[in-house]
A protein has these predicted regions:
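Short alpha-helical donor nucleotide-sugar binding micro-motif in glycosyltransferases
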Residues: 9-14, 104
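Conserved active-site histidine-acidic residue motif and adjacent donor-binding/catalytic loop
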Residues: 1-10, 62
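Short alpha-helical segment that forms part of, or immediately flanks, the ligand-binding pocket
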Residues: 8, 27, 31-35, 46-50
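Aromatic "clamp/platform" in nucleotide-sugar-dependent glycosyltransferases that forms part
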Residues: 20-22
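A short, well-ordered alpha-helix in the C-terminal region of glycosyltransferases
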Residues: 81-94, 103-106
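Conserved acidic donor-binding segment of nucleotide-sugar-dependent glycosyltransferases
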Residues: 57-64, 73-78
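Short hydrophobic beta-strand element within catalytic cores of glycosyltransferases
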Residues: 39-42
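C-terminal alpha-helical cap of glycosyltransferases
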Residues: 97-134
Length: 134
């Protein structure tokens, strides 16, 4: 089990992060790889492509020929540093812990109804409500 700086070092040194899963929720490892600036190739399932439609590439799940073509394509294309920096910023802006926590709270408040709405109006130390600018 690797965390912290050693994990960042691994992601920053990978030429291409490949996630071939066909049944998975939003992958923490995918978010980690993207947040470090790694190029990512994922199976074309909504849980992956919700994150990689802009920064990343996908292949058809369980289609080894499509995976092979995607691997060849991604390994031969350049990935400009400017794009990598945009990717890092996008992930930090949209998927940081505090942002995701605010989004989960919004869903819970929406499901439960009015009693919890007052809680969303209180300023939470260190957090900006989803969609708001810091």
């Amino acid at each position: 089990y690797v965390v912290g700086d050693p994990l960042k070092e691994l992601y920053s040194n990978c030429g291409l992060f490949v996630l071939p899963s066909h049944t998975e929720g939003l992958s923490l490892s995918l978010l980690e790889a993207l947040s470090i600036g790694a190029r990512c190739l994922v199976s074309d399932i909504p849980e992956n492509t919700v994150v990689t439609d802009i920064y990343g590439a996908a292949f058809k799940p369980e289609d080894t020929d499509d995976l092979a073509r995607a691997l060849e394509r991604e390994c031969t294309q350049e990935y400009p540093d400017a794009m990598r920096q945009q990717q890092i910023q996008y992930i930090h802006t949209n998927f940081e812990y505090d942002v995701m926590l605010d989004r989960y709270e919004e869903v819970y408040h929406h499901v439960v109804g009015d009693p919890l709405k007052a809680m969303t109006k209180k300023k939470k130390k260190g957090r900006v409500p989803a969609g708001a600018k810091a």
